[in-house]
């Protein structure tokens, strides 16, 4: 509706920069000038339009852009992705190519990507816009699992019933 919800969250994610004011994380002012900065503060954003490479596997997309020094240990990456999926109830195969995935599986890859990077604050922009009612309920179950694990969840949506179903 043009009120600036996504713009504000993009500032927290390091995509846009505020003209004035300050960002506080755990009560302390911080400077977020890039997505890397936001991850250092435990903030990860899952955008409405996914940023995935279709010919890569889920795990390859999840670790893409990380500087882990040297060659990628794909077996270790697959194991860590599987561990995150098992912990929260996600159902994705780390070795599956993105082009073979459903929309909800692609969204799951994006969520696991921010968890892999250590996000404790997850921002989801219109997360149910392209999901079926069944996929939406499954997503809500996973989000509740994350919340129970101490993660903060911020959802940008126009669907008031979803806000009421998830908020505390």
Predicted region positions:
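Glycine-rich phosphate-binding loops of nucleotide-dependent enzymes
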Residues: 1-168
């Amino acid at each position: 509706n043009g009120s600036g919800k996504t713009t504000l969250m993009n500032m927290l994610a390091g995509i846009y920069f505020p003209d004035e004011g300050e960002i506080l994380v755990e009560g302390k002012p911080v400077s977020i000038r890039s997505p890397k900065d936001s991850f250092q503060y435990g903030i990860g954003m899952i955008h409405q339009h996914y940023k995935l490479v279709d010919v890569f596997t889920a795990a390859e997309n999840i670790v893409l852009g990380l500087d882990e020094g040297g060659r990628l240990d794909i077996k270790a990456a697959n194991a860590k992705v599987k561990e995150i999926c098992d912990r929260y109830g996600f159902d994705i195969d780390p070795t599956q190519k993105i082009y073979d995935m459903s929309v909800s599986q692609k969204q799951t890859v994006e969520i696991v990507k921010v968890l892999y990077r250590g996000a404790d604050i997850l921002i989801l922009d219109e997360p149910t816009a392209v999901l079926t009612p069944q996929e939406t309920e499954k997503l809500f179950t996973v989000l509740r699992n994350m919340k129970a694990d101490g993660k903060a969840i911020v959802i940008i949506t126009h669907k008031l019933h979803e806000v009421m179903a998830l908020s505390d």
